[in-house]
């Protein structure tokens, strides 16, 4: 794993002044309190007092000491000098004449303010443990881990090491966390499952792509065949029995990351991986893909049912429009008959003859039949047209009942019973269903479901 992950900006800004501090930073890092002044005023000479004060405030702000104090922005030098009643900050050049003085002052600052070197125990160990925990539980980029480590070192008064030291440490920690994950994942499948995993990388005879590449492809259309293909993909993954493996204790985000990697990497590259890593990548892929394949199949089913319902509604509305004139004609004829029926001047004894004189009996009977045929109750939602769509449902119904395992909340127990009953009925030639669960059959469906008072199976 490469340690060269820092951006050029991160490398240039590490342990250096990037810009002048703002007011909040000045107050927090560069203000000298009574304790600071007591420590600083123990030094002889204004140049020594200014030099050690700048080293102290730089260590607070940057987390490290600078080899050349003239790299400190002039604004900060003037700000510190003013607090020490030094009118000419230029005397700092005298402080730079003796390196030993600068090193001695660094030692005094570390001792007085409890700063530690990066290699001091237990600080480096604590940082490694924190980095390892984050690398194990999350999928943070190494650049973010670098920023976290820098902030932690600054907060705990640990002097920053060289940037290369910190990047190398982060690379080693991430590598160790990855190898632990690969090792634990590779131990989960048994020998039969490992053979199945290796089979994913093979290209079946007569095919142009490997099984793994086929498993990556999800549904792209909404149709019965598309749902059947999605269901077959799910059952193939489920048959590998990875759902019975114990993935507890493994970070979910890392499993998803490995599975995503398997979905993008070339089959040849995965084939050339070491055994442990290859098994880990494929195990994570099958685990995640089994769940997503089921979700995709159910999504296709949901949209397919919605499409079937919409088609039935459109067909019903078109039928309604086509027959509207016939319905109007029959309704007007019946309205004329009802007008005579409501006329107080019509003799009740001769009512039938009066109606039939104006409206022939056969025409009246035809109109009644037409109204009964075309008029729809208010609670009807195109059930007849839904039944006409059964041919589309029949293509995938048996596979759905066989391969999908449904569960239900208490409110859906009746629906679940009906699904289980249909699954048991699959392949049966029974026409009259004496033992069918009838709780979900609502009013509008009863005229289509019941035959001679009993539930019937009209479609096969």
Feature locations, PLM:
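Long amphipathic alpha-helical coiled-coil/heptad-repeat bundle
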Residues: 2-460
């Amino acid at each position: 794993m490469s340690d060269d992950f820092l951006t050029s900006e991160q490398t240039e800004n590490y342990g250096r002044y990037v810009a002048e501090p703002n007011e909040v930073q000045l107050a927090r890092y560069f203000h000298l309190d009574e304790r600071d002044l007591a420590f600083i005023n123990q030094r002889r000479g204004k140049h020594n007092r200014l030099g050690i004060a700048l080293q102290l405030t730089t260590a607070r702000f940057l987390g490290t000491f600078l080899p050349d104090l003239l790299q400190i922005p002039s604004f900060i030098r003037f700000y510190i000098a003013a607090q020490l009643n030094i009118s000419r900050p230029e005397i700092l050049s005298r402080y730079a004449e003796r390196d030993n003085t600068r090193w001695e002052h660094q030692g005094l600052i570390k001792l007085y303010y409890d700063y530690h070197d990066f290699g001091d125990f237990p600080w480096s160990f604590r940082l490694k443990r924190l980095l390892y925990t984050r690398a194990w539980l999350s999928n943070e980029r190494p650049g973010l881990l670098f920023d976290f480590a820098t902030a932690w070192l600054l907060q705990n008064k640990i002097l920053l090491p060289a940037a290369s030291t910190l990047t190398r440490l982060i690379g080693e920690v991430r590598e160790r966390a990855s190898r632990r994950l690969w090792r634990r994942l590779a131990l989960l499948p048994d020998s039969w499952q490992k053979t199945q995993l290796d089979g994913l990388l093979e290209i079946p005879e007569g095919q142009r792509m490997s099984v793994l590449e086929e498993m990556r492809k999800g549904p792209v259309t909404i149709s019965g065949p598309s749902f059947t293909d999605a269901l077959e993909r799910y059952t193939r993954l489920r048959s590998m029995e990875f759902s019975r493996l114990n993935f507890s204790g493994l970070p979910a985000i890392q499993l998803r990351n490995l599975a995503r990697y398997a979905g993008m990497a070339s089959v040849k590259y995965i084939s050339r991986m070491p055994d442990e890593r290859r098994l880990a990548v494929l195990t994570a892929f099958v685990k995640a893909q089994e769940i997503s394949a089921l979700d995709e199949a159910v999504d296709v089913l949901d949209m397919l049912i919605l499409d079937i319902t919409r088609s039935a509604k459109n067909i019903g509305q078109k039928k309604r429009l086509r027959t509207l004139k016939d319905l109007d004609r029959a309704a007007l004829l019946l309205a004329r008959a009802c007008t005579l029926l409501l006329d107080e001047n019509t003799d009740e004894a001769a009512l039938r003859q009066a109606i039939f004189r104006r409206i022939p009996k056969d025409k009246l009977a035809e109109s009644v039949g037409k109204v009964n045929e075309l008029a729809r109750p208010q609670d009807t939602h195109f059930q007849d047209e839904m039944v006409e769509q059964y041919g589309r449902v029949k293509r995938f119904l048996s596979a759905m009942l066989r391969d999908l395992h449904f569960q239900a909340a208490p409110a859906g127990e009746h629906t679940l019973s009906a699904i289980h009953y249909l699954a048991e009925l699959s392949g049966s030639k029974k026409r009259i269903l004496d033992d069918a669960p009838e709780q979900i059959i609502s009013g509008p469906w009863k005229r289509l479901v019941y035959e001679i008072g009993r539930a019937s199976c009209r479609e096969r």
